[in-house]
Amino acid sequence: MLFSCTFQLQAQEYVQQTDLPTIYIETEGGRPIVSKEDYVDAVLHYVDSNGVKTYDALGVRGRGNSTWNLDKKPYRIKFAEKQEFMGPERAKAKSWTLLANFADKTLLRNAVAACIGDFAGQPFTAGAQFVDLILNGTYLGNYQLSDQMEVRKKRVDIDEQDEIPTEGANITGGYFLEVDGFGAAEPVHYKTKRNVLVTVKSPDEEVIIPRQIEYIKNHMQLFEDALFSSDFADPEKGYRPYVDSLTLASLVYFNRVDR
């Protein structure tokens, strides 16, 4: 996807509104962002104590499930070229998110969970940089700049399967799955016996084959069955052979913190 932003911008001064960085987004022709599927061409100005940095080839669209229906909208940014948008310590990538945190009146839960994840040594936790967001001249408030959840170095760093497997190929992974109550609209999803909706984020629908989907279903079902069995705590008969216990415990804890 190539974003072309040759439209004329009105001259204005881009200033840092508070001690936080300020992000100015100006869409082509001032078009509103009303879709979670269609990107709107835009220019972005990132202002902090180091000055103004301008990105002139990107698109912006909505994101989220239930959060997209709230008054303060979350957004996804996609640059034409990969950017170290949150610095060299994080991913170099095209896609980034602006979280509104509208349902959290402290605005802190997602960021605190990310900090705890870093402290606990989780393999990956999303970035958390608070910013002020101004869209087409209107101040929208405090947002959290963060990573897009995807398979990539310094994000979900697993072996990506980007080709259709050949007959007899090893299909044990890696796989990027999400437990998603709103995932019924996702192209690859299924439910466990306990009605847990699971979506497959990677591999993409274009390359994943039925044999891989069955492998995922079977592995996850074995885990669920063991977790809810009377032997769940047994190191051999319980859930532990199917999952890394420490990262699972961390995930459960972070989900509690993030509510």
PLM regions with names:
Residues 1-12:
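Bacterial Sec-dependent N-terminal signal peptides
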Residues 11-259:
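Phosphate/dinucleotide-binding and metal-coordinating scaffold of catalytic cores
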